[in-house]
Every structure is written in structure tokens, then in C-alpha cells.
């Protein structure tokens, strides 16, 4: 592009040069007959009045001769021209200016920005600066990913937030600030589940495709990393059984029974006896009744496919599915998923902060966060497309701290590429690029490419050092070489040369001062700037870092019952035996017989 522009400029200047050539030819024409001496003398006099042009019989001939000479000169110039790029022979990389970059990308309203470094912000309105708001943050343990990026951006209080919060540090420090700014704070706490808001994935199943996605994502999220089944039959058959159960609950069960604990109840009701192929389990009876009502029910189709094997095969399939869902046998997880309090679509309509707390030393329950992410993207995209004309009224910012700890959909790179127009953005936070390569072996470069901002906070992983060094590029520098020869006619020489050098070599990237960060914005020079100082944020006084008490979620805020005991017990008080109460569960047939229906 640069060479094309230079060529176009040269042609324009050459064409403009015709005018002075013709002018000079007309001044010279009256003196051509007197020879070179007369031409020199006449031109000297003509310069006294340069626009007093006299047309004579030699004017046309002189103009043609001058134009021919000019054309030959231009032809020689273009034919012998060299493509020089002075001071860029080995590379044109150089450092950008943080203040200039900030002036170009920041929003005038300080609260309507994402904080990248101490002196660089980027506004939320991507239509102004034509960059997406997806940010890739890379920094080793202790580099300040949470303190210098996650918390300052959440403290901006300018979007809805979905924060993956290992250990619960972020919600503890800034939850009070968010509530004081009018946010609804919701917490999916997989560390202390008794303090968590409830999350029921069944609530967000709009159609059959959503059911299929839920089951597929559940199986993917519960598959250990690096494991490959040599026989996928069992997983496929188990997924068919799970689809049958989920479809049955979605279309036939009341809303309060549409949850994973009820899936486990149905699974336990499907007892299979290997020595008795004629045995009909309660689950079989349930689907037999469904067949009488609706023979083409989608749940029945999947159940027939599952039930086409022998009793031994069916037993193995049930065991496979039970192993996938075994976490839902825990009372804590069953209670958490029995109902729903998260109201996921509301994140795109009003300011809500949703925190997903996961243990940093145990990944047993992280599959639930994976399902949450998938359903959040589906709900927000659907809301933007079908209710708000393509873009959410409230921007939603996903802050994915410890990104590598949660399984994400295989097409996450495609989701990343289409979320900008919907008013959704993601901050991917990693310890190093090796984590991203392990998660998305083939798509990791596409994910990096869909993040217009890359923030490097420092680390100690070699491949990341090399990647950052190559991203910085090479610059052209001056070098000196010295020579000295000894002897009777010895001499000393100095040679000056130019050479190429990386802006920062991999070892210099490794030695990056812990106070600094490297910032890359698509189409801009790289910037080295201070990491953001959280203590300089205007809202820090409302957080635990600013001296406020830590935010505690899931605690009762008011008494729901009160017992008052009178200290003066009457002397004539007598004890009364409590009336015993018993319960009996009756089937539909028993009820019909009792009430004579």
C-alpha cells in the first residue's frame, strides 16, 4: 500500500512538472536562433519579467524539444528508481505513546471506559474507535491479573458483569460497592453451596435444540481433560437416555420437577434386572403411558433408541450415565439446582453482577459453570436478536479469571467473533499462552485474533516470551564495528552499519519490570506502561481495599420467625402429649378408589 501511494504521488508531481517546462521553453524560444550564448543572455534578461512571454516562429519547436527532454528525464528516473525505506531496512517497529493512544480510544466520560493500564483506557462505544472490546490478559501467578485488571474494571460499574471468581476474592472486595451503585449481586457459589443463589439449567430450555446443547455440553464438561474413550458407544447411548429423561421432564412434568435432582430420581426408577428381561421398571411404565397418549413424543423416540439393547447393555448404559451425573447425588448440589434465582436474561436489560465462585484447588463442580456460560451466551444473543434489534440495552462484560479452569464450547472462537454487535464482550485471563493452546489446540490463534486488545503483565513461560517478542517486531538500529591491525604499518578503523533488532528479545520480555505491562491494540504501536493502580480508582473507598468491611453473600438479613418465652411459668401448668402424625404416599389408583372417582 505504501509503495502504491508513493508511485501515485510521483506520477502526479511529474505531470505537474510539465507546466514549468513549457513556461521555460516559451521564455527560451525567442533566443534559440542566436545559439547558446544568446540563450543564456536572453534568459537572464527574461527573468526580470518572467511572465512577459513572446510567441515566435520557434516557440512550438522549442516547446516540443523541451517536453521531449523532460519526458526522457522522467523515463530515466522511473527506470533507475530504487525502493528505499530509510531507517526501516530491517524493521520499522517502535514504541507507541500511551497518552496519544489514550486520547484516541478513551471516552470523555471516565466511567464509560475499560481500564487497560494506568494511562490507557478504551471506551465502551466500539462504533467510535472501530475496535472490539475483547481483551486477552496474560500474566503469571502474582503478576496482578486480579488486582490490576479484574477488580479495577469491575469497579467502573459501567456494564453488567459475569465474573469467574476463584476463591471468592473479587465479590468479597467489591460486592458492597456494586450494591451501593444499584447493582443486583447474584452469586453462584460452588465453594459454600449453602450460601449460593440457585441455578437450574432447565429454566432456560426454550426448544429442543437447547436440550440437545445442554446434554452435549454436560458430557463435554464432565469429560476429564486429555481422556479419549476408545469406544464412544457408551457415552452416545448414555446421552440418548439423558435426552429422553430431560425431554420428558420438559414437556410432561410440572415446573417444580424440571431439574437435575428429578433426572436422578427417574434414572433410579429405571432399574434393570439382567436375569429377568421381562421385568418392567417404574420408568418403563412411565414411558408406556406416554406412548398411549403421544406415540410420536420426542422423549419416547430417544427412550426407544436407548431401550433397544439387552438388559446387560441397558444396565451398563445406566451406570455410564449415573457416573456422569453422580455429583447431583450430593444434597448440596441437588438443592442448588432444584430451582433458579439467577434470571440470566436480565443481565442484558439492567445492571447485574453475577459471580461464579469456584475452588482454585478442586475442579469437581466446574462443569456447572461451563453450562452456565453456554446458556448465558444463548440467552443474551437471543435477547439481543429477537427483542432489542441486535444489541443489548446494557453491555455485558464477561471477566473470565482463571479461564483455563472451565470447559467452554468447542465453537467458542466463533462465539467470540459475533458477540461484539450484540453488546457483549469477554476478558480472557490466562497465566500463559500454553494454557490456551492446551484448551483449543487448533483454534487458539483464532481466539487471540478475535481479541483486539492484548495485555501482557509478565510471566515465566518461555513460549509466551517468544510470542510477545515476535509481536513487538524488529526495529532498525545503527551498529559500529572496530578493527585494529598491529605491526610496522598498523592501523585502526571504525565501520558504521545498520542492523535489525527485536524491540524486546525473549529474555528481555522475561525480565520485564513487575511495575509495567505491555499493551497491544490492533493497528497501533505497542505501549509499555504502568499497571493500573487500584488505590487511585475513584470508587476504591467503597471497597475492602479502601477500608470497607468485606461483602458477605448468602447471609440472612432479617428474622423470619421469632420465639418468645415467658419467664413466669404458671404453677398449675400441665403437660399435654403431642398428637402423633403419620404420612402415607398413595398412587393415583389408590386415590381413585378412596374418593370413588
Predicted regions and their residues:
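Short gly/ser/thr-rich secondary-structure transition/capping motifs
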Residues: 115-124, 338, 382, 438
Amino acid at each position: 500500500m505504501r509503495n502504491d501511494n508513493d508511485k501515485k504521488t510521483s506520477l502526479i508531481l511529474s505531470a505537474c512538472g510539465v507546466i514549468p517546462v513549457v513556461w521555460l521553453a516559451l521564455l527560451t524560444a525567442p533566443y534559440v536562433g542566436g545559439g547558446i550564448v544568446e540563450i543564456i543572455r536572453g534568459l537572464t534578461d527574461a527573468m526580470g519579467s518572467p511572465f512577459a512571454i513572446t510567441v515566435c516562429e520557434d516557440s512550438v519547436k522549442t516547446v516540443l524539444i523541451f517536453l521531449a527532454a523532460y519526458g526522457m528525464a522522467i523515463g530515466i528516473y522511473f527506470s533507475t528508481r530504487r525502493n528505499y525505506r530509510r531507517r526501516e531496512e530491517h524493521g520499522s517497529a517502535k514504541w507507541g505513546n500511551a497518552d496519544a493512544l489514550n486520547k484516541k480510544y478513551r471516552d470523555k466520560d471516565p466511567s464509560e471506559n475499560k481500564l487497560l493500564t494506568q494511562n490507557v483506557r478504551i471506551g465502551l462505544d466500539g462504533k467510535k474507535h472501530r475496535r472490539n472490546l475483547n481483551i486477552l490478559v496474560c500474566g503469571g501467578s502474582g503478576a496482578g491479573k486480579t488486582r490490576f485488571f479484574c477488580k479495577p474494571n469491575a469497579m467502573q460499574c459501567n456494564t453488567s458483569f459475569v465474573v469467574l471468581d476463584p476463591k471468592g476474592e473479587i465479590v468479597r472486595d467489591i460486592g458492597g460497592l456494586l450494591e451501593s451503585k444499584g447493582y443486583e449481586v447474584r452469586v453462584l457459589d460452588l465453594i459454600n453451596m449453602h450460601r449460593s443463589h440457585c441455578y437450574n439449567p432447565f429454566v432456560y430450555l426454550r426448544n429442543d435444540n437447547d436440550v440437545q446443547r445442554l446434554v452435549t455440553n454436560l458430557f463435554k464438561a464432565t469429560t476429564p481433560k486429555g481422556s479419549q474413550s476408545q469406544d464412544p458407544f457408551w457415552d452416545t447411548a448414555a446421552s440418548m437416555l439423558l435426552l429422553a429423561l430431560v425431554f420428558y421432564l420438559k414437556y410432561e412434568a410440572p415446573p417444580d420437577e424440571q431439574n437435575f435432582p428429578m433426572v436422578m430420581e427417574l434414572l433410579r426408577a429405571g432399574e434393570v434386572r439382567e436375569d429377568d428381561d421381562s421385568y418392567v421398571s417404574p420408568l418403563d411404565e412411565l414411558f408406556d403411558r406416554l406412548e398411549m397418549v403421544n406415540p410420536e413424543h420426542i422423549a419416547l423416540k430417544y427412550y426407544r433408541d436407548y431401550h433397544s439393547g439387552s438388559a446387560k447393555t441397558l444396565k451398563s448404559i445406566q451406570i455410564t450415565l449415573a457416573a456422569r451425573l453422580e455429583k447431583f447425588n450430593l444434597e448440596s448440589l441437588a438443592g442448588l439446582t432444584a430451582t433458579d434465582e439467577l434470571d440470566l436474561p436480565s443481565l442484558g436489560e439492567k445492571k447485574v453482577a453475577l459471580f461464579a465462585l469456584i475452588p482454585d484447588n478442586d475442579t469437581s463442580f466446574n462443569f456447572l459453570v461451563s453450562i452456565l456460560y453456554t446458556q448465558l451466551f444463548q440467552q443474551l444473543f437471543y435477547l439481543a436478536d429477537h427483542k432489542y434489534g441486535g444489541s443489548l440495552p446494557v453491555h455485558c462484560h464477561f471477566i473470565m479469571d482463571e479461564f483455563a479452569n472451565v470447559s467452554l464450547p468447542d465453537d467458542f472462537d466463533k462465539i467470540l467473533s459475533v458477540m461484539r454487535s450484540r453488546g457483549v464482550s469477554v476478558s480472557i485471563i490466562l497465566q500463559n499462552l500454553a494454557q490456551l493452546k492446551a484448551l483449543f489446540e487448533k483454534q487458539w490463534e483464532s481466539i487471540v485474533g478475535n481479541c483486539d486488545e492484548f495485555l501482557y503483565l509478565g510471566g515465566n513461560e518461555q513460549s509466551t516470551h517468544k510470542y510477545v517478542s515476535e509481536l513487538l517486531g524488529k526495529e532498525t538500529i545503527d551498529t559500529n564495528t572496530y578493527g585494529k591491525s598491529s605491526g610496522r604499518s598498523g592501523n585502526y578503523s571504525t565501520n558504521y552499519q545498520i542492523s535489525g533488532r527485536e524491540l524486546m528479545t525473549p529474555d528481555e520480555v522475561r525480565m520485564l519490570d513487575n511495575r509495567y505491562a505491555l499493551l497491544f491494540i490492533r493497528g497501533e504501536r505497542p505501549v509499555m506502561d504502568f499497571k493500573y493502580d487500584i488505590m487511585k480508582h475513584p470508587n476504591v473507598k467503597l471497597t475492602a481495599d479502601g477500608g470497607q468491611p468485606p461483602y458477605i453473600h448468602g447471609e440472612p438479613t432479617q428474622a423470619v420467625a421469632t420465639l418468645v418465652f415467658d419467664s413466669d411459668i404458671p404453677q398449675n401448668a400441665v403437660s399435654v402429649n403431642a398428637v402423633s402424625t403419620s404420612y402415607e404416599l398413595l398412587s393415583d389408583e389408590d386415590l381413585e378408589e378412596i374418593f370413588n372417582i
